[in-house]
């Protein structure tokens, strides 16, 4: 007989034994690791289709949930045009990007009630950009006592909610703001 994984059993065992859970569940990581490598730019293709993680599209830019988030609610805002450096972004595009960043921060704040945010850009691979060829802004909600130290000590991220559930919460706040 095959026993199915039951998170409730593990939680009860951890409480009973005064131990911590030993499983970090991130099923989307294996999807990323095992999928065929795509040579196209994800930030160029995502807004052209019906990507379910897209939160909002504007004339010059779009907001999308990060497929590999640092924390629950980690969003990205990128220009529609393929540019690798902030210096290549026009003033008009930059204004629209910042306006959308503000809108996403507000929606995430209402949907998730974080204690703060990290908002920023990693320009170039040496600066930590996972997708260095297309400029984008990270919006990372933070909570007091969150586990954001995990990437530093074990290259792990703890995400407590399915990404599409989080996306729906944020999208609901965006549609309510209009």
Give the role of each language-model region:
Residues 1-178:
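HIT superfamily nucleotide-processing domains
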């Amino acid at each position: 007989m095959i026993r199915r994984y039951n998170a409730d059993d593990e939680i009860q065992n951890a409480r009973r034994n005064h131990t911590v859970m030993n499983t970090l569940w991130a099923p989307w990581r294996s999807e990323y690791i095992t999928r065929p490598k795509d040579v196209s730019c994800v930030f160029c293709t995502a807004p052209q289709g019906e990507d379910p993680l897209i939160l909002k599209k504007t004339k010059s830019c779009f907001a999308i949930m990060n497929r590999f988030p640092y924390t629950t609610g980690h969003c990205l805002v990128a220009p529609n045009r393929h540019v690798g450096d902030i210096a290549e972004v026009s003033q008009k595009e930059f204004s629209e990007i910042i306006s959308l960043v503000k809108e996403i921060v507000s929606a995430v704040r209402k949907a998730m009630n974080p204690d703060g945010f990290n908002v920023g850009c990693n320009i170039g691979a040496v600066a930590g950009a996972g997708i260095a060829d297309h400029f984008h802004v990270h919006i990372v909600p933070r909570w007091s006592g969150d586990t954001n130290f995990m990437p530093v000590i074990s290259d792990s991220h703890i995400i407590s909610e399915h990404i599409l559930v989080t996306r729906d919460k944020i999208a609901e706040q965006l549609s309510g703001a209009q």
